[in-house]
Amino acid sequence: MILVDTLVWIEHLRAADARLVELLGDDEAGCHPLVIEELALGSIKQRDVVLDLLANLYQFPVVTHDEVLRLVGRRRLWGRGLGAVDANLLGSVALVGGARLWTRDKRLKAACAESGVALAEEVS
């Protein structure tokens, strides 16, 4: 299962990403409530339809506040330009065996690599 980050969704909604279309067709693309919340705050076409579709994908687990703080401390994630959503996504992927994160954020990619969280490969 692949957790798709917000920016990947934003770019897909502007111009369809063939790889994401394939993952969706194979039921391999997952979402997270915080990604849905971030997208809900933006201007997206067919807003209600898109948000409903995202909510019906596999939902990655939500980590608790204490779990995020432990992750930040244990993996020394502070001072790297990561946001709270980034830390939550990293933690969620770590909880799901075999899961990967698809992000285009360089800082989040680096944090995942250092934390042992698998990344989905970009396909050009």
Cite the ranges covered by each PLM segment.
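Non-catalytic, well-ordered alpha-helical scaffold segments
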Residues: 33, 37, 87-90
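Short, well-structured N-terminal submotif of metal-dependent ribonuclease cores
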Residues: 1-34, 40-52, 58, 117-118, ...
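Active-site neighborhoods of divalent-metal-dependent phosphate/nucleic-acid chemistry enzymes
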Residues: 12, 18, 59-122
